[in-house]
Amino acid sequence: MKPRVFFLLFLLVAAMIETGESEENEEGSNESGKSTEAKNTDASVDNEDSDIDGDSD
């Protein structure tokens, strides 16, 4: 039964390490996501400007 306990502890530690790494990756992807959102906002502003000029009408 002791090998099972060690194996389960190993899996628990491995899962905790994986979770820590994925949280760091999510933070990095959120930052890049924010910059992507900013780019999309800029593009939508450009589209609104062309609508005001009457180019799309």
From Swiss-Prot:
Residues 20-29, 45-57 have a biased composition (Acidic residues). The keyword Nuclease does not apply. It comes from the Eukaryota. Residues 20-57 are annotated as: Disordered. Keywords: Secreted, Signal. It is found in: Secreted. This is Peptide BmKa1. It comes from Olivierus martensii.
